[in-house]
Design a protein with these regions (language model features):
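Conserved, structured core segments of small domains
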Residues: 1-132
Length: 132
């Protein structure tokens, strides 16, 4: 019989044994409740909230999601945050003006980051920084 799920702890144990990163983050998919005008009405407050999360070390990454043809934005976005638990992640997202106002709803999924690479390029002569 095919197995359809396994305990998350089994994955954590395997990752630890392999020496991989094993960094627990939370991915938030946030979607419009149907009215782009409602999203636009709170966009400035939302962006200020996001920058505050970033300054406090909570925000890992965030940004808008385009349509599949990459031509339009319909009010959706993805946020990746650092939190100690799913409950804390929910508390953080409930405080977002987008969700408080009802302009967007959200779904949170725990994400264990194991593989990948971050490359930062710094130009000494100009001070320019580039993330690749």
């Amino acid at each position: 019989m095919a197995q359809h799920a396994m305990p998350a702890q089994a994955i954590r144990d395997l990752v630890k044994k392999k020496g991989m990163l094993g960094k627990q983050l939370y991915i938030v998919h946030t979607t419009t409740t149907g009215d782009l005008d409602a999203v636009l009405a709170v966009i400035e407050d939302h962006l200020a909230f996001q920058v505050d999360l970033e300054s406090r070390g909570i925000m890992f990454a965030a940004g808008p999601n385009w349509t599949e043809d990459e031509q339009e934005w319909r009010g959706d976005g993805t946020v990746v945050i650092r939190a100690n638990s799913m409950n804390q992640a929910r508390e953080i997202m409930e405080a977002d003006p987008m969700h408080k106002s009802g302009a967007r709803r959200y779904e949170i999924r725990p994400w264990l980051v194991n593989e990948g690479k971050l490359t930062v390029e710094i130009s000494y002569s100009s001070g320019a920084v580039k993330i690749m």
